[in-house]
Amino acid sequence: MRRSAALTSVTMTAVLALSACGGGGGAQGTGGGTGTTGATGSAATAATGGTVHVLANADFSHLDPVRGFDGGVNNFYRLIYRGLTTFGAGPGEEGTKIVADLATDTGTASDDAKTWTFTLKDDIFFEDGTPITSEAVKFGFSRAFDPEAGIGSPYGKLLLDAPKDYKGPYLSGDLDTIETPDDKTVVVHLKKPFADFPSALALANFTPFPKGTGAGAAFDTKPIASGPYKVASYQRNASLKLERNPQWKAETDTVRTAKPDAFEWTFGLDPATIDERMLAGQGTDANAVGPSIQAATVARVQAPQLKARTLAGLNGCTTYMGMNTTKKYLSDVRVRQAINHAIDKDTIVAAMGGSTLAEKGTSIQPPTVAGRVEYDPYPHDVEKAKQLLAEAGLSGGFSLSLDTRAQPKMAAVSVAVQEALKQVGIEVKINNIDTSTYYEVIGTPAKQTDMAVTGWCPDWASGATFLPPLFDGRNITTKGNSNLAQINDKDVNAKIDEIAAMTDVTQANAAYGELDKQIMELAPVVPLAYEKLILVNGSNIAGAYQSNSFSGGVDLVSVGLAEPTK
């Protein structure tokens, strides 16, 4: 996940409603996304030059890769950052493969996959010309533990072996469990064996940085690039421009084509305005990409001239409602089960734009995750919900607060939840939170209310990236917490450990499918929907395809212009 904004998971705060979700398994992914793919524009392959424009409703959460973890920002990160590994570039399974990036290969495991060794490529540099060394890798990894900065992806803290009191490089110094015997060699020790570690390293929170840099919020305004582009200018909530990074060497990078000379984001646009501009395709909008279109626009893209530049498919994420099990009423499993039965998923789908843009959620894991089991544990049943509430001694009614993003689609979803729970005597008070701070608020247990509408996208197509981050109670943190239910069940924790020890990825994925059912017996969340994307690209956009590693959004590392001089 990545969070979808879903998380983006659900039309995210940022532009393409994208997020990191990929196919796992060490050197090659096995995930099965369902997005329709293809190339758009007047040429299947982008030419060199020109500026790609991106139209967005909201700014990215953070430019610092240990802070940001929502859908839109993960795709963006690959333009300016590189890691030891990354996802391949291409539609379908090609885009879910795990390939070497800064490292010469996807790593060598020892000690039953508890220790991993990597060798860095030659001629790799940061934007200021500083070589990317093993010390930079070690420093970048350790930043995930900083209590202020490390609020994004949980995988650094989940996987890397570190003392319990370690608080990152700025407060605690070096992380000794990452060895750097020379400038080119990195030896990483994990808490436990993890066969999918190369897949985890494809996530941006493992980005190397020069030692000592990035304290506080420094990288949120001026990050240090290692990819083909660097930040040229940035006005928060208004615009962002990337220009070429002259220190990037194309011969060291098999993934990023870097065809455009620049990328320019425009933030703060109304979704309906974006739709109108993308359909019209006038001026620089012919060179633009944007988020999934709104429900009201769907019928219009059936016109042949628009259909030719349209992509559609599942975004690979689950939109869900987390229920804080530490709260008075929600600590009772019967109440949580009642809420699951009470919510009418058809009204949720309608709120998200209808069946063209969403399908009903049943399991926690979305259809694109390997090993996922198709089942529906809580079909809509108002009478069953009332019965469970009566058994809990709450037939007289009570009230709950629901956190949601101040964004039209999520507001509509929240109202649908409110109306459904009203039918069983539960009054829901909706708490609208600004998109730019939403995940920080709901990820801070001290600030959480009763429930929150959010989303999660697998970081690669495995339950390992879906269920442990959301439901392992031993990893609840004071900031950047992804276990919104704050559930800490010993049987669930034990099963997570059992699956994590499996070295057969197929066996592990099947076990996660069964764990999904075990968790839903406790009803800590309500799976609401699986969102679909319909993307209309500018007529001059080339090389565009939906990526299964970025929630069905356009993979920015391959996109470019058919005619750069237009």
Over which residues does each language-model region extend?
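Long beta-strand-rich cores associated with HINT superfamily self-processing modules
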Residues: T36-T37, L535-K566
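Surface-exposed binding/hinge segments that line
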Residues: T119, A136-K138, D146, G150-P210, ...
